[in-house]
């Protein structure tokens, strides 16, 4: 990583504005999944060890620039306090006199959590005045919110222009793992691209075709490829305007010597529900009024073999409608193949893939689960992430 990190700077007695990603699910004022809070702990603990006065900032949900009571960060402060085992102060603003006073009262190693930064309309507009106001609270800026690194907002990008700006440990790890995967991968290198829409994955497929040895396609987007090959797909998901593009990807793979895998069979259903009638059929046998909602057993076996023979696998997007148990088998098979592949470094690209490995209880058997859905996707597209670009170079 060519950016400075929190390890590279002297922080004793300094006020540090640390942007974290505490955008966690809540129910009735209680955090229901604290994964993202836990992910930030190493950075917070290192800041405390280095004697910093820690000012944490995060967004939560989409309050659209106004105060939404149920999107206040108080439940997050409560959970963070439990995890850290020490007090976490909380203010109801993210800048201004009240925030300044709380920041000035901090002692070395103390922790303060500011209010939801998206309560301010200037946050998502990257308003320079708001960025300056955030910066005025601190001596150093640490960005540990990889999940928001693809956004140029006041607390993720604007602030970095006003104070020393460095990466947190989580940000550093994400950039190192994803960076190495894309620039200097161990081979064979396999990418598994799933999800519903071709249009969401065009950039990723384009960028990865230049880098991978194997490209595996699954999920709803696969049926546009299958239709483009001349097969009937019944009522399966189709983006007719992307069929030419799908063909061109397959051609490009051939030219580059990349093995391009699409499903050879599918689980089809007569209805989009858990209690639909289902059957496994070869890909050219999908009945006219049924839809394919998962990859079939032959495809699972093929994909498993490719995964097992790979040194590096990046996975972004499920193989089927894994939220419904009847169509979760393909996604589970891929997750299990990754869990069983001892010599394979597995990178799970956030979002639905991360949710899937959690659901199947296999998360701790993956080498790296990215904390950023959109951010890891844009990184894999080869795009520069504004929140990273703004940090100080080494």
UniProtKB/Swiss-Prot annotation:
Cellular-component GO terms for this entry: cytosol
Which enzyme type, at the first EC level?
transferase
InterPro entries per the UniProt record, alphabetical: Phosphoglycerate_kinase, Phosphoglycerate_kinase_CS, Phosphoglycerate_kinase_N, Phosphoglycerate_kinase_sf
- Which Pfam families does its entry note? PGK
Binding positions for substrate per the UniProt entry: 21-23, 36, 59-62, 118, 151
**One GO MF term:** ATP binding
Which keywords does this Swiss-Prot/TrEMBL entry list?
A: ATP-binding, Cytoplasm, Glycolysis, Kinase, Nucleotide-binding, Phosphoprotein, Transferase
GO process annotations (BP) = gluconeogenesis; glycolytic process
Q: At which residues is Phosphoserine found? A: 183
Q: Write down which residues bear the modification named Phosphothreonine.
A: 299
Give TM segment ranges: none
Residues recorded as binding ATP, renumbered to this chain, are 201, 323, 350-353
Annotated metabolic or biological route of this protein: Carbohydrate degradation; glycolysis; pyruvate from D-glyceraldehyde 3-phosphate: step 2/5
Q: What's the EC number here? A: 2.7.2.3
UniProt-annotated location(s): Cytoplasm
What domain of life? Bacteria
Catalytic activity reads: (2R)-3-phosphoglycerate + ATP = (2R)-3-phospho-glyceroyl phosphate + ADP
List the Gene3D superfamilies.
Answer: Phosphoglycerate kinase, N-terminal domain
* Quaternary structure and partners: Monomer.
Q: Family assignment?
A: Belongs to the phosphoglycerate kinase family.
Protein name from the UniProt record: Phosphoglycerate kinase
């Amino acid at each position: 990583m060519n950016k400075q990190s929190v390890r590279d700077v002297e922080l004793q007695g300094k006020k540090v504005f640390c942007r974290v990603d505490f955008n966690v699910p809540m129910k009735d004022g209680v955090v229901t999944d604290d994964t993202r809070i836990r992910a930030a702990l190493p950075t917070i603990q290192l800041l405390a060890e280095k004697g910093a006065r820690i000012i944490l900032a995060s967004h939560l949900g989409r309050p659209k620039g106004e105060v939404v009571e149920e999107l206040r960060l108080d439940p997050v402060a409560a959970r963070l306090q439990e995890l850290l085992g020490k007090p976490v102060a909380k203010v109801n603003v993210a800048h201004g006199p009240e925030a300044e006073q709380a920041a000035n009262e901090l002692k070395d190693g103390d922790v303060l959590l500011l209010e939801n930064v998206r309560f301010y309309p200037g946050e998502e507009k990257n308003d320079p005045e708001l960025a300056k106001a955030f910066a005025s609270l601190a001596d150093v800026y640490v960005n540990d919110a990889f999940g928001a690194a693809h956004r140029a907002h006041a607390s993720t990008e604007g602030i970095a222009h006003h104070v020393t700006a460095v990466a947190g440990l989580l940000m550093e790890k994400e950039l190192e793992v994803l960076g190495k995967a894309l620039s200097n991968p161990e081979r064979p290198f396999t990418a598994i691209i799933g999800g519903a829409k071709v249009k969401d994955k065009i950039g990723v497929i384009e960028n990865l075709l230049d880098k991978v040895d194997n490209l595996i396609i699954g999920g709803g987007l696969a049926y546009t490829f299958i239709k483009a090959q001349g097969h009937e797909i019944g009522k399966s998901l189709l983006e007719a305007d992307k069929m030419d593009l799908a063909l061109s990807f397959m051609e490009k793979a051939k030219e580059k010597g990349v093995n391009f895998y699409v499903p050879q069979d599918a689980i089809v259903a007569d209805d989009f529900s858990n209690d639909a009638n289902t059957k496994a059929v070869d890909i050219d046998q999908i009945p006219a009024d049924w839809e394919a909602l998962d990859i079939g057993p032959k495809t699972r076996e093929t994909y498993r073999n490719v995964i097992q023979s790979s040194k590096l696998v990046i996975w972004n997007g499920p193989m089927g409608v894994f939220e419904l148990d009847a169509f979760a088998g393909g996604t589970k098979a891929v997750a299990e193949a990754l869990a069983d592949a001892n010599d394979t470094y597995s990178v799970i690209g956030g979002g639905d893939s991360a949710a899937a490995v959690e659901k199947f209880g296999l998360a701790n058997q993956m080498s790296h689960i990215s904390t950023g859905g959109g951010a890891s996707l844009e990184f894999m597209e080869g795009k520069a992430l504004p929140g990273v670009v703004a940090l100080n170079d080494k």
